């Protein structure tokens, strides 16, 4: 009876707590996310409502993702500039969620408050089939909610929406106070 408890240490017990293994089965993720979309779809009457419900769920996830990333980061420093926060989202947050960086980060030519994160083939839309009557549905609204929460909880309040353009584009529109603060920091 005691022989089963006297084996050598398990590889699981040897892992460091600071950097847990973050891989999730793609099929498990696809199943859970499609069930989440179906659950939300059964409780709404329009595509806009469905996208806002997915964004609200994404905001809940985003707050927790930010907490986890900040807790794991060694020598964590708080970003004070908009570009630094956006690069954190494009790099560290995207890697933690999807295993790779986002494809592109761009700023709008005509508006200093607007930035775009472009993902050509978003993982979140890969296994979702959309009927023709809901052709405007973009399930990346969930990702937009995550990004909005990460930025807002980092001290950069913004509104993030998902659009179909060059794949999926997340449009990030910061509040005017954020841009004014960024300009004031540049002047120092």
Curated annotation (Swiss-Prot):
CDD domains on file: TRAPPC5_Trs31 (cd14943)
Keywords: Endoplasmic reticulum, ER-Golgi transport, Golgi apparatus, Phosphoprotein, Transport
Keyword Endoplasmic reticulum listed: yes
GO cellular component, one term: endoplasmic reticulum
Location in or out of the cell: Golgi apparatus, cis-Golgi network; Endoplasmic reticulum
Record-listed Phosphoserine modification sites: 10
GO biological process: COPII vesicle coating; endoplasmic reticulum to Golgi vesicle-mediated transport; vesicle coating; vesicle tethering
The UniProt record lists the keyword Transport: yes
Subunit structure: Component of the multisubunit TRAPP (transport protein particle) complex, which includes at least TRAPPC2, TRAPPC2L, TRAPPC3, TRAPPC3L, TRAPPC4, TRAPPC5, TRAPPC8, TRAPPC9, TRAPPC10, TRAPPC11 and TRAPPC12.
Role summary: May play a role in vesicular transport from endoplasmic reticulum to Golgi.
Family from the record: Belongs to the TRAPP small subunits family. BET3 subfamily.
Protein name per the record: Trafficking protein particle complex subunit 5
Organism: Homo sapiens (Human)
Gene that produces this protein: TRAPPC5
